[in-house]
């Protein structure tokens, strides 16, 4: 708490990356003279989930205005993923790193309420805005995948009944733009 009307909250988060303890199987089926011939290559512990780091900061003014910013980093560039490679002795199926990029996510949001303790219901409506920018972790033909942009707006309408005055009906609308890095790819809007 900074003073009577202002407070700041700092948050940190960590997600432990780990192997999934499963098998990755590659099935190769070919047709030779009307007969299907198959081969299977297996790899134990071929998949991993990334370490995740996050930091967030929220400023609260008099319980009427909240502004928050978050940053999240997922270390996808360090995870192992099964890859089929051709060598002089045939095919090999191994877990390799560097097939993905690190994902960064930047978020910003705000909420405003005229009077959170007001007698009139319309004074307790919560107005919200938010924006998110995300870099991709996927790669397409060696290039970074599509970047993601999102914006949203919403309201929280208080519902008052004889049992509780804490119920809120949340309504929101959002827009998302997916922008590929490869020229000629389709851009998507939701």
Predicted regions and their residues:
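Outer-membrane beta-barrel porins/channels
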Residues: 1-190
């Amino acid at each position: 708490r900074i003073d009577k009307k202002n407070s700041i909250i700092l948050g940190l988060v960590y997600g432990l990356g780990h192997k999934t303890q499963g098998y990755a199987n590659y099935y190769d089926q070919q047709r030779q003279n009307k007969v299907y011939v198959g081969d299977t290559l297996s790899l134990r512990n071929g998949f991993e989930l990334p370490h995740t780091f996050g930091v967030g900061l929220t400023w609260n003014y008099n319980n009427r205005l909240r502004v928050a910013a978050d940053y999240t980093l997922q270390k996808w560039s360090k995870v192992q993923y099964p890859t089929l490679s051709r060598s002089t002795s045939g095919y090999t199926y191994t877990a390799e790193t560097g097939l993905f990029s690190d994902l960064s996510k930047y978020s910003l949001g705000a909420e405003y309420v005229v009077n959170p303790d007001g007698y009139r219901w319309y004074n307790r409506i919560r107005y919200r805005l938010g924006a998110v920018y995300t870099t991709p972790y996927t790669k397409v033909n060696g290039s970074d995948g599509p970047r993601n942009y999102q914006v949203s707006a919403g309201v929280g309408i208080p519902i008052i009944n004889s049992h509780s005055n804490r119920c809120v009906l949340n309504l929101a609308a959002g827009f998302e733009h997916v922008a590929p890095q490869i020229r000629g790819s389709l851009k998507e809007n939701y």
